């Protein structure tokens, strides 16, 4: 039996997730992984088993290296050693992406899982994201989910203009209600 579109399921489309990450791993020398939503570390087992790795998860029953709010970690921790940031969230990865873009220097890969199309179609995107996109706080836009690619482009451009994280190259794929994106970024200032 399949799960309804709104029900979260860990690692649906595992093949696509692994393929996107394997592409990203080839983009950096000596990858050092920061996994912001590590869960039960299925992706670590599939992609990162022999690599330096640090996993974050809020749930205390997971084998994470630290159990905390990943935004707090991204705001305060030294991110210098990480050059591969994995943000596999059930919803909107852009808050974490923007924090990484603000604080990370040098060349790095960011892998994002977006499951925001359902939220976007119901106009449940964050106030912050609406602000960046130029959408008034209370405005409801029918079928906004059709513009996921445009919204992703705006967020990447915002990271470049606001924080100097230059987008170099990337790939994307989608399946069901999830979009997968890996981008190579470089920040020199």
Predicted feature residues:
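S-adenosyl-L-methionine
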Residues: 1-50, 58-84, 179-181
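Structural motif
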Residues: 32, 83-84, 109
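Conserved beta-strand positions in the Rossmann-like core of class I SAM-dependent methyltransferases
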Residues: 54
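Short, charged, surface-exposed secondary-structure boundary motifs
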Residues: 63-66, 119-124
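A short, conserved alpha-helix within the catalytic core of class I
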Residues: 91-104
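Conserved beta-strand signature within the Rossmann-like core of class I S-adenosyl-L-methionine
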Residues: 107-121
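A conserved mid-domain beta-alpha-beta active-site/ligand-binding segment of alpha/beta enzyme cores
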Residues: 128-186
């Amino acid at each position: 039996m399949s799960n309804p579109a709104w029900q979260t399921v860990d690692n649906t489309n595992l093949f696509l997730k692994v393929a996107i990450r394997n592409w990203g791993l080839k983009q950096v020398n000596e990858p050092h992984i920061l996994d912001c939503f590590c869960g039960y570390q299925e992706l670590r087992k599939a992609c990162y088993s022999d690599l330096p790795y640090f996993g974050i998860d809020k749930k205390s029953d997971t084998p994470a290296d630290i159990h905390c709010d990943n935004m707090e970690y991204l705001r305060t921790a030294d991110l210098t050693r990480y050059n591969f940031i994995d943000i596999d969230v059930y919803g909107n990865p852009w808050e974490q992406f923007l924090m990484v873009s603000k604080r990370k220097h040098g060349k790095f890969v960011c892998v994002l899982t977006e499951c925001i199309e359902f939220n976007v179609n119901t106009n449940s995107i964050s106030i912050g994201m609406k602000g960046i996109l130029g959408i008034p706080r209370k405005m409801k836009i029918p079928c906004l989910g059709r513009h996921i690619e445009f919204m992703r482009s705006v967020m990447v451009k915002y990271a470049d203009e606001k924080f100097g994280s230059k987008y170099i190259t990337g790939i994307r794929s989608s399946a069901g209600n999830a979009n997968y994106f890996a981008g190579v970024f470089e920040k020199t200032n």
